[in-house]
């Protein structure tokens, strides 16, 4: 039968064996992609500098997901935190990738088997001898099994009872490591940034899923509900499954973009809101102030700031700075970070400390403006020199570095001062290597941005798919143009499965 491309899925209508086959093949493709992508990323990943060139700067997409579940070692002899290891064990990055590829191959073979041997006794209704599926019972089985998996993940893997735990870090992404997590059963478990909520919610949701699965296995739906929701139609299953998937996609798009315990910044990069709110800048200033309160010099206080913390406070790591259609990793944009030059402190000729106004997220260019502690503009880099009153030359601005590679170095010549003022707009100043990757200097987004964009886009698409298939299954008789109580042959829409005379609509 000459099916148009958009109707090819009708071949698995009323064919449970081949419906199962195509789903197994889909699982094979997903697992095969995951394993292959992991091997590709491992081939190009450079683990040598986890501070200034972490996985998210290199555009790694699947490695962060493996890492947050407890995989940290490679058969290449390296650890994700920068150390070396001698016995990575089976469950290394390569081991997980290989397991996915082996699983993919087995699913591929199983899909072929089920395609060839499609007419199995298990799919036949013993009363009619025709293929049929007990969809409410299948729903109960799936709910029960997914509940067991959910409960097992929360109770064993996350807690470390049987498993490694998950990636846990401090609020500033400095001390992250894989460790067991105790369930948080109090109100704190509802805080999206508390790792204990991951364990407790999986245990609770898994328990609910197990109980709900047993309920649906032991209780039949009422006839009115069964007919009203078209529970005997496979397209109802499709519609409700799409609903579950698009809802999950919207949720994870949110937890990724806004940040949560499930998306640590060490693995996925910072969020845009941490730049917008000066999150890392405030912590850096708090640490410097604490150092000064302990009678440390300004130089010593800034020298104690971890390079990792300073690097987060750089606009090039903001996922909202990269355009959605700029291909490549962050390293392909502004370059590979080599070192922190230090914190520049600007002063005018009266000795008043000046602060460069930082570039907001959605600006490509921004005027260089220096304000004092009260927010009053004291200096700038003017667009029109003839009308300038606050130029660096007129105000006599100097810059001195504290911490980093230029610790203790000061500059007073206007050209150099303006250069560092422009760079200070972008947060802490880093030396960036653009030669190695031929980086073009245009900011890129991090995997956090790609994941969010992809999942939000597909969630919207799947939302419309849910509406489409839900409407089709609920109003099938209307769309087919057939009175459900009519069993006479009708030309238009007579066959549920196109070209198949065995599926002529019967009166119920």
From Swiss-Prot:
Signal peptide extent: none
InterPro entries the UniProt entry points to: PS_antenna-like (IPR000932), PS_II_antenna-like_sf (IPR036001), PSII_PsbB (IPR017486)
Keywords per UniProt: Chlorophyll, Chloroplast, Chromophore, Membrane, Photosynthesis, Photosystem II, Plastid, Thylakoid, Transmembrane, Transmembrane helix
Protein location: Plastid, Chloroplast thylakoid membrane
Cofactor annotation comment: Binds multiple chlorophylls. PSII binds additional chlorophylls, carotenoids and specific lipids.
Transmembrane stretches, start-end: 21-36, 101-115, 140-156, 203-218, 237-252, 457-472
Record flagged with keyword Cell membrane: no
GO molecular function, one term: chlorophyll binding
Pfam families reported in the protein's UniProt record: PSII
GO CC list: chloroplast thylakoid membrane; photosystem II
Keyword Membrane: yes
Biological role stated in the UniProt entry: One of the components of the core complex of photosystem II (PSII). It binds chlorophyll and helps catalyze the primary light-induced photochemical processes of PSII. PSII is a light-driven water:plastoquinone oxidoreductase, using light energy to abstract electrons from H(2)O, generating O(2) and a proton gradient subsequently used for ATP formation.
Family to which this protein belongs: Belongs to the PsbB/PsbC family. PsbB subfamily.
Subunit comment: PSII is composed of 1 copy each of membrane proteins PsbA, PsbB, PsbC, PsbD, PsbE, PsbF, PsbH, PsbI, PsbJ, PsbK, PsbL, PsbM, PsbT, PsbX, PsbY, PsbZ, Psb30/Ycf12, at least 3 peripheral proteins of the oxygen-evolving complex and a large number of cofactors. It forms dimeric complexes.
Name of protein: Photosystem II CP47 reaction center protein
